[in-house]
């Protein structure tokens, strides 16, 4: 039997907050200091496109008071229009967050630019990026299939917008907010289903409830003053370690300094309701974000997970792969609906999960907006080849199952975990008793 115990202090800094801290720093007037910035491939892609678009920044590794190495990023900017025409297409690699959110900034710059990515990113839908920016007066061109490259002829004369998000998307909400900061007047973004709210928190935007919807108010052409940011540990990364502890009976793990923003930590409530023994300790607020420690103790069996609420799906969209694999291995069952957004991620995550779970002997059926795991028909006798589909979250979800249960698996691409969790495998090894 495999058992995992220990204290986790080296969880990756939050990916979402790191992206936004860098982009907001580039939009701010003055010097922005970001402590504990993520070293993952996606966040480094954001720094790369900022540098290529004329923003002055530097990063260095520092030794913290507890002996840990932390990454500091310093950004120097003169404000909203500090960007310069790039000499070549801006490479976003595999980072959809970089491409989508930076498009909102480039739409307001008085020059032409082009955003490209790797083969996976170039297949992902970008019409949701173009639609609101075109309504604001920007000229954006996509491929005939509505994907990148995104060719932008920016304009300093963007119009304010009242934009109702057609689907819950923190990336689209953020790109509209970034563009609206440059507009000549006040804009409003309307959410019928909430998504993660880091951009609003970090920019200090006002919001209110109206007719059951959330309205976010973005002032136009208002100076964004530079301020320091601290990046807490990524709850989406913490989910993998939580699952590790819950799958391996007798395990006890404490995960330090995790972002517990209510729009990000809903997976903890789901697991607690299913019988998981999870305790939040040392809870506090830093820079507007709730942070705390998660204690994972494996004392009881988990009930199967049934996830159908669209609002809940929006809050746990990145954690669903791990929750699905955890529920399948722990209880034999899992059911998900209203999650069609999963088909537009780094891979078609619904299909990727079903294909790999079936290889492991689970009886699965997929739908346009989700899938169901009905039980395990057989337990494979030999090593099972798992296809990561070039998707870091698919790779890590099945790696956790293999590590915790001893199920022999062979991952098709282990390097892809570097997108968000470079020290993933080293951390797992350090926790095994």
UniProtKB/Swiss-Prot annotation:
InterPro entries (UniProt xref): Enolpyruvate_Tfrase_dom (IPR001986), Enolpyruvate_Tfrase_sf (IPR036968), EPSP_synthase (IPR006264), EPSP_synthase_CS (IPR023193), RNA3'P_cycl/enolpyr_Trfase_a/b (IPR013792)
Binding site residues for 3-phosphoshikimate: 15-16, 20, 169, 171, 195, 318, 345
Keyword vocabulary terms for this entry: Amino-acid biosynthesis, Aromatic amino acid biosynthesis, Cytoplasm, Transferase
Pfam families, per database record: EPSP_synthase
Catalytic activity: 3-phosphoshikimate + phosphoenolpyruvate = 5-O-(1-carboxyvinyl)-3-phosphoshikimate + phosphate
Single Gene Ontology BP annotation: amino acid biosynthetic process
EC nos: 2.5.1.19
Cellular component aspect of the GO annotation: cytoplasm
PROSITE patterns tied to this protein: EPSP_SYNTHASE_2
Name listed for the protein in its UniProt record: 3-phosphoshikimate 1-carboxyvinyltransferase
């Amino acid at each position: 039997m495999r058992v995992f115990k220990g204290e986790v202090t080296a969880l990756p800094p939050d990916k979402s907050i790191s992206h936004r801290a860098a982009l907001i720093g580039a939009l701010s007037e003055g010097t922005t200091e970001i402590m504990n910035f993520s070293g993952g491939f996606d966040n480094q892609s954001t720094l790369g496109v900022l540098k290529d678009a004329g923003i002055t920044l530097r990063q260095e590794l520092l030794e913290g008071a507890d002996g840990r190495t932390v990454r500091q990023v310093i950004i120097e900017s003169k404000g909203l229009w500090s960007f310069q025409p790039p000499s070549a297409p801006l490479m976003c690699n595999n980072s959809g967050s970089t491409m989508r959110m930076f498009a909102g900034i480039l739409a307001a710059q008085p020059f032409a630019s082009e955003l490209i990515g790797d083969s996976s990113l170039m297949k992902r839908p970008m019409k949701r990026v173009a639609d609101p920016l075109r309504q604001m007066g920007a000229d954006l061109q996509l491929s005939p299939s509505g994907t990148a490259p995104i060719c932008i002829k920016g304009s300093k004369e963007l119009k304010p917008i009242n934009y109702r998000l057609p689907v819950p998307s923190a990336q689209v909400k953020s790109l509209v907010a970034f563009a609206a900061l440059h507009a000549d007047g006040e804009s409003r973004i309307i959410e019928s289903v909430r998504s993660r709210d880091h951009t609003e928190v970090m920019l200090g935007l006002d919001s209110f409830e109206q007719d059951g919807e959330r309205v976010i108010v973005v002032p136009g052409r208002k100076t964004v003053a530079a301020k320091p940011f601290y990046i807490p540990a990524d709850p989406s990364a913490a989910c993998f370690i939580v699952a590790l502890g819950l799958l391996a009976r007798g395990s006890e793990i404490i995960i330090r300094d995790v972002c517990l923003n209510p729009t990000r930590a809903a997976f903890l409530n789901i697991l607690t309701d299913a019988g998981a023994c999870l305790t939040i300790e040392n809870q506090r607020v830093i820079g507007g974000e709730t942070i705390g420690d998660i204690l994972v103790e494996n004392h009881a069996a988990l009930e199967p997970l049934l996830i159908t609420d669209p609002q809940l799906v929006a809050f746990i969209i990145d954690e669903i792969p791990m929750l699905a694999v955890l529920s399948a291995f722990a209880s034999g069952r899992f059911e998900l609906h209203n999650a069609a957004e999963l088909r537009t991620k780094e891979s078609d995550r619904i299909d990727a999960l079903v294909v790999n779970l079936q290889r492991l002997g689970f009886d699965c059926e997929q739908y346009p907006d989700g899938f169901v795991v009905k039980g395990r028909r057989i337990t494979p006798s030999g090593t099972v080849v798992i296809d990561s589909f070039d998707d870091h979250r698919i790779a890590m979800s099945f790696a956790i199952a293999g590590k915790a249960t001893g199920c022999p698996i062979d991952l098709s691409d282990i390097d892809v975990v570097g997108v968000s969790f470079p020290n993933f495998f080293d951390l797992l090894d350090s926790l095994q008793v």
